[in-house]
Amino acid sequence: MRVLFPLLEEEIDVSQESLVSDVCASIGLPLNLVCGGKGRCKKCLVNVKENGEMKEVLACQYSVSDGMEIYASREQAASQILETSSNSDLPFDPIVKCYSLNYTDLVTPMCTYDLDVLRKLIPQTIDTPDYSVLKHFSEVYFLEGYERLHVIVSGNRIIDFIPSNEKEKPIYGIAFDIGTTSVVGYLYDITSGCLLNQHSMLNKQIAFGGDVISRIDYAGEGPESLHKIYEAIMETLAEIITQVCKKASIDTKDIYQTVYCGNSTMAHLFLELNPKHLGLAPFLGFCKDAISLKGMDTPLPINPKGTVTFMPLLGGFVGADTTAVLLGLPRDKKMRLMIDLGTNGEIAVGNCDKYYVASTACGPALEGAGLTMGMRGTTGAIEKVGCENGKITYSVIGKTAPQGFCGSGIVDAIAMLFREGLIAKRGNFIKGDALDAHPMKNRFGVDENNQRYFKIVTAGENPEGKDIIITQKDVRAVQLAKAAIYTGCCLLSENYGIKGSDLEEIVIAGAFGNYIDVHNAQFIGLLPKIEGVPVRSIGNGAGTGAQLYLLSKEEAGICNAIPRITTHIELATDPKFVETYMMNTMFGDNVMI
């Protein structure tokens, strides 16, 4: 059965029972299945042409038919992904190195061993290689016609020998930050420490759900489902590897080291380990240590003898992305609160001696998902909202007609509504005399479900002629998300034994944290506002940490030790959780416990 993608000028063969969302994912267009393909979120609406009739369908519920045309585009799947990180001057002493030796120096004296000669020529400790490497060594040691023997070493272990007439052999590595929504890869020449380029794209696992719980549920359906979601992340990584190598004009087989960070669910799915027990109390994973594989153990297009390392996890849903962020923080006694404003809402408090960490399960609302007109940070998303002299102002990604709100836009919009007296401290839209007296009263409306909404952009203001609204339900979703984050900050600090006034810096990590208006976030009670305590955004802190691990043997060792100074706290078991959480659903700059 043939299915066509006119906007891509492509067509593919599919099986009869395929869903539109599955077909889109197979061609590299993973749609935003926030609800895990259950048909509830309605974020995967797509136009199709079937039997000559154009219609809008839910991709996760609608089956393809022969000759169907699906009008999905790369832009529909593209989003505003943060690639930049805060460190530009990274230390350089990589785990993987290349030593280039002259064949003329490989002279074995009487009654000695070739490997001992090699060890004397390499200025570091060399352990006995694996059998396959030792066998390869015996084959290349006496080769004629070559001037140089390049020896690739990972840690203290030789992983490859390359006979050559070239004086030097450049080798490359990639540091990856695997997010629930997006994946970023940084390509380095690890003979020089030079960043060559970087590339990002959506995590193709988004076709199986927009959050970790949806993906845990899907993977837990059986081995076939687990393998499909494993293949999705491998395809994502393979595309990034191919793209960065193409841009740098290098062979993917010259990639000898890759390093990965991501939350605990991403780690399990990367390793094709069933994450079922992560989704059930007491939220246990298989292993939190750094895990190393060989390239040949994966379908990734790197050198099969190269190293593949997933950084260590910290406990529960707090994974290697948080470990990576902590690795990139200054190693001093300054007391910090670190907040990663993503779907899992990881939080850490402490200093270089001791950290407490927790995840807050704040949901996808702060990333624009799960809202009536929420969307990823892509073209058409409102990213900034304000009000000047009674007139609502906004800016749109791509400077096009507005389609909905991304995370930073929804925070600004809620702050504006609260500041202008359009919602009360408890989150209710105003009504009665307060509504009648308000100059923006005509922007309110009621939908078919008798739910009130407010028009941030009216149909008359929008070139596409549609209202862009925030409903009462959307306000509640933001209240729950911000309460989760703020409660996490309060209880984690209390468990650590400090008050808000003891903090010396608040650090915001992640893509959303980089785009958010900090003052608006503090105004609605999403972020703590503590007098004299600065708030600093570090961009993609997880990406910085992954690069540190790639480029420095010492940093990798420090990273592997972070779990030993870190205590994971399960916030939901704290006796104060419910009371604190309910208090923090209120809008306003709350006071930390």
From Swiss-Prot:
Organism expressing this protein natively: Eubacterium limosum
Stimuli inducing this protein: Up-regulated during growth on proline betaine or L-carnitine.
Residues that bind [2Fe-2S] cluster: C35, C41, C44, C60
Name of this chain's protein: Corrinoid activation enzyme RamQ
UniProt KW Iron keyword: yes
Residue intervals of the 2Fe-2S ferredoxin-type domain: 1-76
SUPFAM superfamilies reported in the protein's UniProt record: 2Fe-2S ferredoxin-like (SSF54292)
InterPro entries reported for this sequence: 2Fe-2S_ferredoxin-like_sf, 2Fe-2S_ferredoxin-type, Corrinoid_activation_enz, Raco-like_middle, Raco-like_middle_sf, RACo_C
Names of required cofactors: [2Fe-2S] cluster
Lineage: Bacteria, Bacillati, Bacillota, Clostridia, Eubacteriales
Purpose: Involved in the degradation of the quaternary amines L-proline betaine and L-carnitine. Component of a corrinoid-dependent methyltransferase system that transfers a methyl group from L-proline betaine or L-carnitine to tetrahydrofolate (THF), forming methyl-THF, a key intermediate in the Wood-Ljungdahl acetogenesis pathway. RamQ is not required for the methyl transfer, but it stimulates reduction of reconstituted MtqC from the Co(II) state to the Co(I) state in vitro. It also stimulates the rate of THF methylation.
Gene that encodes the chain: ramQ
One Pfam assignment: RACo_C_ter
Cofactor: record remark: Binds 1 2Fe-2S cluster.
Keyword vocabulary terms for this entry: 2Fe-2S, Iron, Iron-sulfur, Metal-binding
